[in-house]
UniProtKB/Swiss-Prot annotation:
It is a multi-pass membrane protein. The keyword Cell inner membrane applies. This is NADH-quinone oxidoreductase subunit H. One of its GO terms (biological process) is aerobic respiration. It comes from Xanthomonas euvesicatoria pv. vesicatoria (strain 85-10). Disulfide bonds: none annotated. PROSITE patterns: COMPLEX1_ND1_2 (PS00668). NDH-1 is composed of 14 different subunits. Subunits NuoA, H, J, K, L, M, N constitute the membrane sector of the complex. The gene is nuoH. Belongs to the complex I subunit 1 family. GO terms for cellular component: plasma membrane. Keywords: Cell inner membrane, Cell membrane, Membrane, NAD, Quinone, Translocase, Transmembrane, Transmembrane helix, Ubiquinone.
Length: 363
């Protein structure tokens, strides 16, 4: 299936290169659109799925029966786009406008190094993991800027909460990925997936030897995206909407889009780092040469990656529907007193497992 896609993309790439410098620019613009458009479409359907899943959990009639809930998310988009963007008179006008863009840009830029299959990646960077750490850390600057530029005590309090929370859990996420780097011997995302390949199927994935780091990265990813039960940044019962309290219309929609794009991104990264990315859970168990439309079931391919992503993306919604919000001090305590010490200990354990051959790098 991967070869079929490449047969379509390669001739198109060569045609653009044949146009000279202008073709190179057009190809770069096309690659940007290849990131932005699918992410925006994925966010739209993710919102529909969130409404339907929570509707099933809460037995709500709207998302379950009225048009199957499909039109509610799109109605929200049109409502926000046609609303007026009102700026507070005491706000910093330029920074107020820049803040949502500064939040959205890193959320989209991070996708450029995410591999969907062995050869299906926009930029196969050798430092892809470090690039991702940098991009996922930049989004908080837009939140801080929004809180400061709004000149509102609620917005500023939400921004300060976000800064402390992201810094705390960014350290835990970084340490968790150090374990992945030690186990794989690479910071290239495709090579990290290949390091989990073998003839034992899912037993070769990093999920088993790095299970504590998997849990830390997963929970930290939820906290990093400010989602329930770590959504104190925009705690409705305390600070109304946090850093977004003064935003409306399209500007508010940009924050919304960045949040959901980051949720999908974290779901992809968990699948790549710990669940073998596009690898099949029965890799090496079946050897049969049949149609490329079927052999991905045991040889691996992007459908496996999408199924893993779907599970983690749905887990985000499940967390929101099931767990109450943590207090701010509980979130800080969990990050600094539990996750960071645990990751430091397991980095040492991972190094020993690699040294003694317990973790074997794949093909």
């Amino acid at each position: 299936m991967n070869e079929l896609l490449l047969n379509l993309v390669d001739p198109l790439h060569q045609w653009f290169l044949g146009l000279g410098d202008g073709g190179v620019v057009l190809w770069s613009v096309l690659k940007i659109l290849l990131i932005a458009v699918p992410v925006i479409v994925a966010v739209a359907f993710y919102v529909v799925w969130e409404r339907k899943l929570i509707g099933w959990m809460h037995v709500r009639h709207g998302p379950m029966y009225v048009g199957m809930g499909i039109f509610q998310a799109f109605a929200d988009v049109f409502k926000l786009l046609f609303k007026e963007i009102v700026q507070p008179t005491s706000s910093h006008k330029a920074m107020f406008v820049i803040a949502p863009l500064l939040t959205l840009a890193p959320a989209f830029a991070a996708w450029s190094v995410v591999p969907f299959d062995a050869k299906l990646v926009l930029s196969n960077a050798n430092v892809g993991l470090l690039y991702l750490l940098a991009m996922t850390s930049l989004g908080v600057y837009g939140i801080i800027l929004a809180g400061w530029a709004s000149n509102s005590k609620y917005a500023f309090l939400g921004a300060m909460r976000s800064a402390a929370q992201v810094v705390s859990y960014e350290i835990a996420m970084g340490f968790a990925l150090v374990g992945v780097m030690i186990a794989s011997g690479s910071v290239n995302l495709s090579q990290i997936v290949f390091a989990q390949a073998g003839n034992s199927g899912f037993f070769d994935w990093f999920l088993i030897p790095l299970f504590p780091l998997f849990i830390v990265y997963w929970v930290s990813g939820v906290a990093e995206t400010n989602r329930a039960p770590f959504d104190v940044v925009e705690g409705e019962s305390e600070i109304v909407a946090g850093h977004m309290v003064e935003y409306s219309g399209g500007a508010f929609a940009l924050f919304f889009l960045a949040e959901y794009a980051n949720m999908i991104l974290v779901s992809f990264l968990i699948s790549i780092f710990f669940l073998g990315g596009w690898l099949s859970p029965i890799q090496g168990w079946v050897n049969a040469d049949v149609s490329p439309w079927i052999d991905w079931l045991w040889k691996g391919g992007w459908p496996w990656l999408l199924m893993k992503v779907f599970f983690f993306a749905s887990a985000y919604i499940w967390f929101r529907a099931s767990f109450p919000r943590y207090r701010y001090d509980q979130i800080m305590r969990l990050g600094w007193k539990v996750f960071i010490p645990l990751t430091i200990v397991w980095i040492a354990v991972t190094a020993l497992m690699v040294f003694y051959g317990v973790i074997q790098k794949g093909v």
